[in-house]
Amino acid sequence: MPGVTGQHREAFGLIWHSPALDIPELPERLIGPGSGDRAAIDIAPEAPEGWPDLPPGPHDTPFLQIARGDLRLTVEDIGRFRITDGVRIAWHRQHSGVSDQDICTFLLGSAVGALLIQRGSLVLHGNALEKDGQAIVCMGHSGAGKSTLAYALMQQGWRLLADDLVAISPDGLVLPGIPRIKLWHDAAKAFDLDPLQLPPIRQGMHKYLLMGEAVQRATEAVPLQALYLIHQHRHDTPDPDASRIIRITSQKAAALRLRNQAFRPRFVRGLGQEGLNFMALARLQSRVPLASLPLPAGIAAMQDWLERQDLLQAAATAEGPALAQQDAEMVTA
């Protein structure tokens, strides 16, 4: 374990010590008196040849090995990662052509997510934003528009709590995580940003990072007020329900949808955290309303629509689906 002196990074209520790899996406923190009670995470390069063998497990894949307290991840043509006991991430660069940013991209996703799961955290795949001391979490499949929504809300006075990985404490607080937003080239242009002035998330990709001064971030854990499942929908459809926020009232449907938004369910199962994760999701479902959030196609239309919404209250006050839709939810759940 590293000592807690000097310059470190901070996220998810933890101190991250990475002397060999700069991780600019994580906020810097100068450790002072009274900070010794914060858990410190060690991030270091390490040759995989020295890693002990793991017995084959039921959740292994060609690129993943999992045992209790030990997860190994191989990213083709990038590198390998080993996450142990919720306190350490070892990384190995596949070859000299792999940049530090390439390593950071995967380290801050699957590796950090695995470490949080090892520590017993409930981790959702989404974005978290704060306003007036309360948080919302927006979830959805890859490409649903989570990052675009996060940036649009930030332009309307919200502050970013976390991107991609959202960790929720047992008492329902959303922890400040990784304060960055990733935008594709077209989205960056639509927000009047110059992609040439933004670092790409990986070499050769037309997806860019907004971090540091480009992001208004929240720095304190805050209560979770609402959960949203986002999807793109044309608001000129004749269906009157298409443009309204709909609360998911079926307990069975809500449980299934929340479970599907947990970060890397295979990690959860392989690390032996499924029971703990199930209880955390059930507790979250009982406390926080879940609703679908239909985003208009096009950034300008989405921004205009969002200005008319009160997302802190909308999930709780929204009506449920029509009876026929409720029946369909029960069948699919």
Feature roles, as predicted:
Residues 2-26, 127, 131-141, 156-333:
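Glycine-rich, often acidic-flanked micro-motifs
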Residues 146:
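Conserved lysine of the Walker
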Residues 1-94, 98, 307-333:
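Long, basic/Gly/Ser/Thr-rich N-terminal segments
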Residues 153:
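Aromatic pocket-lining residues of Rossmann-like dinucleotide-binding sites
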Residues 74-77, 83-132:
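Extreme N-terminal, non-catalytic leader segments
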Residues 53-67, 97-103, 224-232, 252-260:
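Short charge-dense sequence patches
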Residues 149-150:
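Post-Walker A alpha-helix
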Residues 32-34, 64, 120, 218, ...:
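Sterically constrained small-residue positions within well-ordered secondary structures
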